[in-house]
Amino acid sequence: MADLLAQYEEYLATEKHASQNTLSSYMRDLHQFAVYLDEFHPMPLPQVTQEVISGYVAWMGGKGKSAATITRSIASIKSLYTYFQMSGEVSANPAKGVAAVKVEHKFPEILTGKEVELFLDQPQCVDAKGYRDHAMLELLYATGIRVSELISLNEEDVSLSASFIRAQSKGKERIIPLYPAAVKALSHYMKEVRPQLLADPEETALFVNMNGERMSRQGFWKIVKHYQETAGISKDITPHTLRHSFAVHLLENGADLRSIQEMLGHADISSTQIYTHVVKKHLKDVYQKAHPRA
């Protein structure tokens, strides 16, 4: 079993050119499926039937796994058996007839304007780390970019004079404006702080860790969780929370959906439309609480 999974992982990496995140997600799902098989249905992967996979889906549901997790796991298993069909291990895909679970649509966590101000005020601008963290958080809320885009930014992607950044995702570039407070925070960081942090003068990364190397996704996540704790905000704040809040606050203040779609880098406007539902839900909640006859 381990050999077949290793071959499939090699196929994803070399033939499909899967990203590290995609690779990790697929293999995590498949290793969990393999553990289930080992415990409840000891058999080689090519002998697995549709009934076995359906049983696994029911088992995950019984364990309280979310609909999104179950649906993703089915997709991972289906992809594995598509590969087995190509390699001649199986003649039919046993996962093909397994029904996906309907995903519940959860609205993203949104910070209020006051919560954003409180959160952005947490970094203490008294040392290099404080100035760097303040610049990162201001930039994230100013632009709504993804954390992967934030840590991929290079110094040349920022135009302080024109107040914008260039963000890139999946080979596409977009220009996103910056508000004055973000420009001010970035300017101080880039001119006064970043040069002190660099381990290598040739480093191109805009944001670096305290060792002078490009900031990692995990490193930034820890920074966000730290400031959530110091701010005393009960909502679960992730790097994506500021992206969601950016979109909703723009929408609440009159921005059109197409412009928000462009700034967020959504290929399909349906991905952006969820924010209209968030705004409507917020208005309904306000109405229910404030109207004397509600």
What are these regions (language model features)?
Residues M1-A294:
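Conserved catalytic core of the tyrosine transesterase superfamily
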